[in-house]
């Protein structure tokens, strides 16, 4: 980095074109970009469009580590990165990867946060101060001397963010940093990013599928498709003006934009504040007001598909007085009692570290309870091995890489079926249909590690669907996916549920839970805090708040309207809000 070039831009991408090794197809195609110092850039696009590949050019992980062929130049502060070394750039350009496990390599949380500053050669006092500040920012002070391998998914993600914050880089690239965080953790991290950007003028490049949370924070939005930047502008403008194009790419507008448009707001630069939306709704409902006709109320109720299983009332899973004490003495499950019927679609929610994965893991006997028992189809599972249980339970791990180990996409899906000793023809049929369902047929011969994160997640799901188990346990299956793929996948899961399969979905995505789950269980610090129909649970704001959860926007509006005396049902989705308004002859813009 000797001869600075004459330019104001902090980062310039000039005609960047890239192909991975052994592949002729261009993953990045003639990308030209300029980023100014202090910009907060949101990068969006469908799964597999090249977002992660693009951001890895910022510190030359592409092509130095990935291999492959890169043409064009990346210039940071006037200096051509082709003359730079990856390890040096890593100190200037912070990067929070999609999978936190790939960047946590110390034994304990605080050691991991100190690693970067130590490499910068900072004095001991400064290192300590930075570690303290980062711990506070990521709210992990209490876990500072915990071993990394004992952390929950979200706690690991916070640690990975903290490690980067401690380096105080000029440019920080974050590849879906909130994908495993609970809603209040997501808000905290995004708020922290906003502060870093505003106060320290750190340039931020954020890949994020949760647009509701970020579109008002970022100055600029880039949308990619098939290796190209196809839209570049103010997030609000793009989301409002390019809705058709975005929807085709599987990018859905945030609920607040959808609802404000329905209600006739004519916004130019930002969405109206929540209070204005509530006020407009109250005004619109006033004429038909507070006494609802029984018929219309019936129509507005959430449409929950009845499970078709004839044995509906029988317990598929019964969890009795289950407690789990870890080796370090901490109690991660406390007297959990649950009765899950055949054909239920339930969601398991809770703050990071609440015990969701630990509870789900007990179903597979990954952990042994310290007391209590679990009955599956009426039988105590303590008699079964994990291998036997996996023939009845399709279990999707939080991190897809924990369950992918074959050399090709096809073989990966086939692997589980081989263990079931199914005839070859039937096996092929099931593999092909699972790959097609997850839109992975074109990658059938590819090595799974040469897929994007979202594609690997879909591969893990395909492997489980091919087994056709009666009980599906899905631990955050939608991480890293665009809305289009998420809906296709969850529609399929709902179809299976209607055929009688029982579904347990662990998720931090309240909008999806509101749309798909019939029953919602909220956990807090190892205990069940709430358990009931989705509409009821989402209308319990105090308890949800205590568990770090934020109800979806339509549910919040319904609740506040009730407080004002309106007789409204527990609406959970934008389409329920629409039908409710129509039933009251309220004119809406669709
Ligand atoms: N090592 C590799 N070899 C060949 N192709 C690869 C490799 N890694 C990724 N790809 C392909 O490059 C394309 C872009 O991948 P990338 O990870 O950049 O996508 P993405 O937009 O970040 O996706 P996601 O949102 O799912 O993380 C994908 O089609 C993927 O299959
Ligand atoms: N091996 C272990 N030893 C000690 N504590 C552990 C161990 N594994 C997990 N824990 C702790 O148990 C608690 C529950 O973890 P779990 O993974 O079940 O949470 P979770 O609700 O699934 O969280 P997330 O939403 O972050 O994935 C966490 O605080 C975690 O730190």
UniProtKB/Swiss-Prot annotation:
Pfam families given in the database record: ABC_tran
Which SMART domains does this entry report, sorted A to Z?
A: AAA (SM00382)
Q: Which residues form a coiled coil?
A: none
Primary subcellular site in the record, as a coarse category: membrane
Q: How does it sit in the membrane?
A: Peripheral membrane protein
Q: Where does ATP 2 bind?
A: 350-357
Any single GO CC term annotated in Swiss-Prot or TrEMBL for this entry:
ATP-binding cassette (ABC) transporter complex
Q: Which InterPro entries match?
A: AAA+_ATPase, ABC_transporter-like_ATP-bd, ABC_transpr_CbiO/EcfA_su, ECF_ABC_transporter_ATP-bd, P-loop_NTPase
Chain ranges of the ABC transporter domain: 11-251, 317-550
| Binding-site residues, ATP 1 | 45-52
> What are the TM regions of this chain, as residue ranges?
none
Physiological role: Probably part of an ABC transporter complex. Responsible for energy coupling to the transport system.
Q: What is this protein called?
A: Putative ABC transporter ATP-binding protein MM_3016
Q: Which organism is it from?
A: Methanosarcina mazei (strain ATCC BAA-159 / DSM 3647 / Goe1 / Go1 / JCM 11833 / OCM 88)
